[in-house]
Amino acid sequence: MKKNNIVLFGIAVLCACSVPKERQPLTGGQWGEIKNGSAEEVVSSEVLYWQAPPASKEVLHFYDATAHDGTRSLCISADGLANGYWNNRVNLKPWSKYRFKGWIKCENVVAEPQGGAGFRLQGVEVQLPDFTGTQDWTLVSCDFETGANDCVTVSCLLGTEGKAKGKVWFDDLSFECLGTEVIETSIKVDPAEQKAEMSPYIYGQFIEHMGHCIYGGIWAEMLMDRKFWYAPGQKGSPWQIAGTDKAEKGLYMDETAPYTGRHTPVLKSDGKRIALKQTQLGLRPGISCSGYIVMKADREMPVKVMLNYGSFTQELSLEVGTTYRKYPVHFSAFDHKVKDATFSICPQKEGRLWIGTASLMPDDHIDGFRADVLALLRGLKAPVYRWPGGNFVSGYDWHDGIGERDKRPPRRNPAWTGVESNDVGIHEFMRLCELLDTEPYIAVNAGLGGVKEAADEVEYCNGTEDTPMGKWRKQNGQAKPWKVKWWSVGNEMFGDWQLGFMSTEAFVKKHNSFADAMWKVDSSIHLIAVGEVGRWDEMILANCADRMDLVSEHFYCQDWHGGGLMTHVLQIPRNIRRIAEAHRRYRRDIPALEGKDIRICMDEWNYWYGPHIYGELGTRYFLRDALGIAAGLNEFLRQSDMVFMANYAQTVNVIGCIKATTTDACYASTGEVLKLY
């Protein structure tokens, strides 16, 4: 009999317990049932319950009449080196012993450099043989224990340790339960056992300029691409040209003297039909909206501005002059929710109308932030927010987000899709932190950015009024320094997806030069170094330990496992434990860490998988994800001697704990857990 003694303060969300024989999994097959393990069930060319990659010229996946028993088997064939697989998810009882059996046949299988064809059980620790050459039907069998796992993915592979070629058949796969341990769960309270105090910074959050996290999420602006990065009517633009069959007949882009950015749209009005419009605006019941349009015309011109939904229309009449001016607009509240309102700008006289920029916000916004989203953010009570990225920061120039908001240049998002309007920069982020009573944590651009840019950013935030950057900050409306404490030197610079990514050796030098320059500006700031378990960490910690206070680590979990609830949930605490254990090893093995307490800043952690229904990477979360986040927070408690800060990534929409559409906002299942903690 296995006993699990659990300290009360660290009790997990899920306790391993015995599973009655009559109780079966909530989804999928019965315990130990591999559906269609003999490949006999087919519909047209589809082998039921098995998944294979999309069809390609390199490798073929099909059922074949060659069988060990019955009339069909799974087959993979490749003339050249390739990777092929058939996958099937199987539910297994936790704390049980199983026997796996499967039959394999090979014909001219060649592997380079190693491996071959064979079975793999993803989710449990077991070694299975590889096959090469030509072999008749051969039985593969192994016994294994599930532990706390409750699922496995069975993979039939051509190319187990690399690529392979040839032909391979798989048939008659099965699992047999050899026994299940009875788990006695007990709670033990030991007041004499004390761990390191848990840091309040464990409950931090992370927001990045991507998808609908900032724009379409936290920020209240209702108009997308309000500064016209894309020419209206062009692919990618939310703006449309009405009144003409071809956009170029009704509009051109003025690049000679743009109001902001690289060009400004000019409507060529015939006085009757031409209009610029944006659809799919959301309106909440009882909340009016206001904004403005910056315009000029080549002659005095009457312009109608309309907000309409179905047969309901509100119309404003403006008289536009020949120099740029900001024209205010206001629309009364609708008495019901509207998800597809249309905003239109309609010149009423023949001539040309320049539209420099436009803005529209609900009247309940708080300093530009959505009131409903802000209320949910406050409910999280997060002590620290990391900003602005993420991958985004490696291509971000913080100067773009400073100064008059309408004049800040729009940019293509350097790391993700969409347009960066630069409406939310340092001043707006700092105001958000004030509204949430939270601490700011700023990542500097150590990708494409330089040392001076980072040092100037520190001075802009923390310098006195007599410094060059402090003077500029005062000119932009903030005389008093913000005294930002937390700063990171870059983001994930170890990855080839990162703008400006480089070798560990090169980044060691770059980190140290950034740290020296940033500390020269303000020696009181706390610096966080880019980390990644393995050689990167070892090099950074060995060569930069004197120039950091914390080291960053990231992890995300998917649903690539066999589908079991416990397996899904336990991914989070297992990853936290894995990273913490690695850093304990570093402390033992790296001389530069002697006498230092460089703890982990887990500034990105979460589940990250589909379905993405809230914009770019806007994951929908389920109860199983909430349980995993709760288990993760409990694990942070257990690892409190190694983890100082953690930032759930990301807060709104993009893999976020808060979901917001144009009309509504609420906590995701993960948000409900974070709020409780």
Predicted regions, residues:
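An active-site-proximal structural segment forming one wall of the substrate-binding cleft
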Residues: 331-336, 340-342, 362-382, 429, ...
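Structural recognition of the beta-strand scaffold that forms the well-ordered cores
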Residues: 203-207, 383-388, 440-443, 485-489, ...
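Noncatalytic carbohydrate-binding groove/subsite architecture in carbohydrate-active enzymes
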Residues: 341-347, 351-352, 471, 503-633
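The substrate-binding groove and active-site-proximal loops of carbohydrate-active enzymes
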Residues: 359-367, 408-422, 439-448, 490-508, ...
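Extracellular and organelle-lumenal recognition/adhesion modules and their flexible linkers in secreted
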Residues: 18-422, 439, 449, 455, ...
